[in-house]
Amino acid sequence: VVAFGGRVLASATKGVKVKYVNSPESEIYHKSNELYGIYFAKQAIVKQDRCFLVEGYTDVISMHQSGIENVVASSGTALTPGQIRMIHRFTNNMTVLYDGDAAGIKASIRGIDMLLEEGMNIKVCLLPDGDDPDSFARKHNSTEFQAFISEHETDFIRFKTNLLLEDAGKDPIKRAELIGNLVQSISVIPEAIVRDVYIKECAQLLHVEDKLLVSEVAKRRETQAEKRAEQTERERRMAERTAMMSQGS
């Protein structure tokens, strides 16, 4: 045990209006480095070679009680590089479970590019309106829950494309922004073959030529490489200065 974490069941409870209440950060507890449920889930994740990602504590507890153990929670925060590496130690496959809150989904998908950057296979499953993983798990056993996921989960890039297309409608400016958004997600994927597959599929969905997306992805990757090189150089100079200061003292 490294900290306490709680879910506020009524936003008006004693004036508390936040969704989750956690212990303050300490020498042993850094929220960005923890995944709720990982200790109990890791064996099931390895065995099934898949991890389910949910938002909160009650989602994990109810899914465990229903018989689904390969599940962890980000505790209401965007995934951090440390959390992603923790999951990636056990599997390359993740399914993110969302409730029907469109605003929440759009906010959450912004952080999934980091999973793609790690080369992970990401899928998304949207639960029925009015349900979250907690309530859905309390209504269904593990077989029914797993069957629903298998039937409704979608590849992340395809899910993101359809979600943003619905939001953009026929607005040309929004559609241009949509293309830029998708290009950014595809560009961080390390495997060239996977990028090529996504480019072809997105080109069909967006009714644009493959070569346009190929060109834009190449530009983004070049920019990313330049930024990484600059960061490496900054770190090298910082290390040199630190070493010189140590020698001087």
What are these model-predicted stretches?
Residues 1-90, 94, 108:
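Phosphate-handling DNA/RNA-contact segment within nucleic-acid enzymes
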Residues 42-51, 78-94, 99-249:
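A charged alpha-helical hairpin associated with nucleic-acid processing machineries
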